[in-house]
């Protein structure tokens, strides 16, 4: 039976994208499935859908921060909520598209995810 194609739509600005990213290689090894990374611009999707990002809603934001910490603790992931949130990533995500056409894609996204969600850089 052929392996299923799984697309992972992500934006470096999303802490949930980061946490999922930290688990993907493990998942690929355990299942033999290959995950296809699909860079998106989450801010543009929010505008298109006319919604406020969950992290910018005060009530949802409090829950989001607790939920992210619980996940990070459970899976022993280095993580801290970015003090500059919401971070602007349009240029980074454009770079991810270019990196995806070259051999350095994984290194590129690893570095930016760590900068955003471990080192809390902008």
Predicted feature locations:
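Structural alpha/beta surface segment adjacent to cysteine/selenocysteine redox centers
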Residues: 12, 18-119
């Amino acid at each position: 039976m052929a392996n299923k194609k799984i697309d992972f739509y992500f934006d470096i600005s999303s802490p949930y994208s980061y946490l999922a990213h930290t688990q993907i290689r493990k998942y690929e090894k355990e299942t033999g499935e290959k995950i296809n990374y699909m860079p998106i611009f989450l801010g543009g999707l929010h505008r298109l859908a006319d919604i406020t990002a969950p992290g910018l809603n005060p009530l949802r934001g409090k829950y989001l921060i607790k939920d992210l910490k619980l996940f990070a603790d459970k899976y022993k992931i280095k993580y801290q909520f970015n003090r500059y949130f919401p971070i602007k990533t349009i240029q980074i995500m454009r770079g991810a598209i270019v990196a995806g056409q070259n051999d350095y894609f994984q290194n590129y996204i690893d570095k930016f995810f760590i900068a955003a969600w471990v080192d809390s850089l902008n």
